[in-house]
Swiss-Prot record:
Pathway noted in the entry: Amino-acid biosynthesis; L-arginine biosynthesis; L-arginine from L-ornithine and carbamoyl phosphate: step 3/3
Gene giving rise to this polypeptide: argH
Organism from which the protein derives: Shewanella piezotolerans (strain WP3 / JCM 13877)
Sequence similarity: Belongs to the lyase 1 family. Argininosuccinate lyase subfamily.
GO cellular component: cytosol
Catalytically driven reaction(s): 2-(N(omega)-L-arginino)succinate = fumarate + L-arginine
Protein name: Argininosuccinate lyase
Cell location: Cytoplasm
HAMAP family (alphabetical): Arg_succ_lyase
A Pfam family this chain is assigned to: Lyase_1
EC number: 4.3.2.1
Gene Ontology BP terms: arginine biosynthetic process via ornithine; L-arginine biosynthetic process
NCBIfam families named among the record's database cross-references: argH, PRK12308.1
Gene Ontology MF term list: argininosuccinate lyase activity
Superkingdom of the source species: Bacteria
Length: 461
């Protein structure tokens, strides 16, 4: 039986019921719906709707239902209820009879689902923070293990300047720390309790909403009933945070896919995160990384979906908002598995130091050092840039590195070049000079790594 049947003289069509019912999606809110109902039973007891004995009976029945459904979610789906709220109420009535019909007094499914969803976001959000923390740890451990491996840094996917592999790892640590901070901020803003605001105008029962919020673990109650039941900002914000984080995951995956390619050969991925070809026996494909990259678009789609759903809704609640959960659930599931998989990939990754060093020594990645050398000799940088460009063209034509050009040939481009030029053209010199804060010199990378190890980031809200 629908919770709203009294107004209607005929049954809903089977097609409408299939179209309207949300239980196949929102069954995942069972724990939150029951927890919220337990808190609501206590709240309406305090304003005289229920006796203490009735409240005790409802609490017992709700806890029993929670135990039953936590191990058998199929029980929920098989009920054929309209939504998770209807399932809980119908189950409660089956257990305690007419007493179960009193629980919804003063409450609407509008404030009920808003409460359920925020409780779910808080719980799942905390789990995502922990997964982000584990990925951060995996990157730090990889940076520590391969801190001084030399590799080419790229711009436009062209070799640019040499960097340390540890520096590359710590670049992604910075990104994922920002993701942690963003999610923490979103969860703080979501830490307000909607329960007790009714359908849109507030509840007619003079309950203590501050106490009600505290009983559910919220920092405070919401302050405007119209906004409360209309609000899905927390869904939008979490999907946005997930999209940014997935973008970071996808960029890291793309880097690693390239590093793993035969053309680069910088790293070797562990067998447990790769797969083969059904036709080509030699293939070892980076499927884990490619799926991370692929799932990023899926998460973006859910963000656009909820933004588009909400963009023109009048106050207060509209049925359109039922579409909030499917995308959110998929976002959180996709984000979680990608974080776990990325950490697993990193844990088994091996760096081919000979190959990375060889690549860093090619592509004239020391050209900037020659320009800086000329600047130190008194030449304006723009002129030095031009001189070095000419020298590089000459070296390319002769298929030789800059450091292998004879001194006389280098001096043909600028008379201020002396024999000490070769000292600045080594890989070691290129790296050592990047000693300003945030640079890729070994002391700077070691200092940055030590800071990440000594000061663990907070992973709660």
């Amino acid at each position: 039986m629908a919770l709203w049947g009294g107004r209607f003289s005929q049954e809903s069509s089977a097609l409408f019921k299939l179209f309207n019912d949300s239980l196949p999606v929102d069954y995942r809110l069972i724990e939150q719906d029951i927890i919220g109902s337990i808190a609501w039973a206590s709240a309406i007891t305090q304003v005289g709707v229920l006796t203490t004995d009735e409240c005790t009976q409802l609490h017992a029945a709700l806890n029993e239902l929670l135990a039953e459904t936590s191990t058998n979610p199929e029980l929920i789906i098989a009920s054929g209820a309209e939504d998770i709220h209807s399932f809980v109420e119908q189950s409660l009535i089956a257990k305690v009879g007419d007493l179960g019909k009193k629980l919804h007094t003063g409450r609407s499914r509008n404030d009920q689902v808003a409460t359920d969803l925020k409780l779910w976001c808080k719980k799942e959000g905390q789990e995502l923070l922990e997964l982000l923390g584990k990925l951060r740890t995996a990157l730090i451990e990889l940076a520590e293990r391969e801190i001084d491996a030399v590799m080419p840094g790229y711009t436009h996917l062209q070799r640019a300047q040499p960097v340390l592999f540890g520096h590359w790892c710590l670049a992604y640590v910075e990104m994922f720390e920002r993701d942690i901070s963003r999610l923490q901020d979103a969860l703080k803003r979501a830490d307000t309790c909607p329960l007790g605001t009714g359908a849109l105008a507030g509840t007619a029962y003079p309950m203590d909403r501050v106490k009600l919020a505290q009983s559910l673990g919220f920092a405070s109650p919401t302050l405007n009933s119209l906004d409360t039941v209309s609000d899905r900002d927390h869904v939008v914000e979490i999907c946005s945070d997930a999209s940014i984080s997935m973008m970071h995951l996808s960029r890291m995956a793309e880097d690693l896919i390239f590093f793993n390619s035969g053309e680069a050969g910088f790293i070797e991925l562990d067998d447990e995160v790769t797969s083969g070809s059904s036709l080509m026996p030699q293939k070892k494909n980076p499927d884990a990384l490619e799926l991370i990259r692929g799932k990023t678009g899926r998460v973006y789609g859910s963000l656009i979906g909820i933004l588009t759903t909400m963009k023109a809704l009048p106050l207060a609640y509209n049925k359109d908002m039922q579409e909030d959960k499917e995308g959110l659930f998929d976002v959180m599931d996709s984000w979680a598995i990608c974080l776990e998989m990325a950490a697993l990939v990193l844990s088994g990754l091996q760096v081919n130091r000979e190959r990375t060093l060889s690549a860093a020594q090619q592509g004239y990645a020391n050209s900037t050092e020659l320009a800086d050398y000329l600047v130190a000799k008194g030449m304006p940088f723009r002129e030095a840039h031009h001189v070095v460009g000419e020298a590089v063209v000459n070296a390319i034509a002769k298929q030789t590195p800059l450091e292998d050009l004879p001194l006389e040939e280098l001096q043909s481009f600028s008379a201020i070049i002396e024999a000490d030029v070769y000292e600045c053209l080594t890989i070691e010199s290129c790296l050592a000079k990047r000693e300003a804060l945030g640079g890729t010199s070994l002391p700077q990378v070691k200092s940055a790594l030590a800071g990440k190890q000594v000061i663990p980031i907070a992973l709660s809200i």
